[in-house]
Amino acid sequence: MAAALWGFFPVLLLLLLSGDVQSSEVPGAAAEGSGGSGVGIGDRFKIEGRAVVPGVKPQDWISAARVLVDGEEHVGFLKTDGSFVVHDIPSGSYVVEVVSPAYRFDPVRVDITSKGKMRARYVNHIKTSEVVRLPYPLQMKSSGPPSYFIKRESWGWTDFLMNPMVMMMVLPLLIFVLLPKVVNTSDPDMRREMEQSMNMLNSNHELPDVSEFMTRLFSSKSSGKSSSGSSKTGKSGAGKRR
């Protein structure tokens, strides 16, 4: 009897030890399984559309064109008919643009809801609150070839005349020529005021006196008028004497 009990005791000890080992391994396995199930994969969608260049066949330009979604986060390619499909895109707001070295396309913003509903609108960087809806699937039309260079301006006479140095030389000359014709030079008070104002401007004594120049200019014209008047009166008097 005692021998049987001593033979059963090691078996019981082994059973107890194996139960402890299994109980210690189960929480670790449960923890590992809960961590893997916490990482979820959301739904993915696709953006569809068509790019068109008026008057040009798609085969002539689609080989060098690409469809970019948010820069280069998602890249798509054009089919032979100009259509495109960009797959594996999660819900959110994206800027879709067709990039081509020969033609320019305006970018379009596409909003994708969690249920897969699409909404397209123009990209307006100036008025961000302004929303202009576009049809979906996208219909992207080229606005013409891109302008990589600025056209050089041609030279014209207006550029020469509007030069500040030319204006500084021409305007004083026009003033000296046109002012005596506009102002009544026979009025001595007006002449005196003009001479005083010109003397105030002529502060440098090394320069010629402007008032003296104006006096000579006006006196020459007045003397010419007086001489012409006297000659006319002389001729009329001689005619009367005859």
Swiss-Prot record:
Any one GO MF term held by the record is:
carbohydrate binding
UniProt entry keywords in alphabetical sequence: Endoplasmic reticulum, Membrane, Signal, Transmembrane, Transmembrane helix
Q: What's the superkingdom here?
A: Eukaryota
Query: Looking at the UniProt record for this protein, which Gene Ontology cellular component terms does it annotate, in alphabetical order?
Result: EMC complex; endoplasmic reticulum membrane; membrane
GO biological process, any = protein insertion into ER membrane by stop-transfer membrane-anchor sequence
The entry sums up its family as follows: Belongs to the EMC7 family.
- Subunit structure, briefly? Component of the ER membrane protein complex (EMC).
Q: What is the protein's given name?
A: Endoplasmic reticulum membrane protein complex subunit 7
Query: What is the organism field in this record?
Result: Macaca fascicularis (Crab-eating macaque)
Could you tell me the gene encoding this protein? EMC7
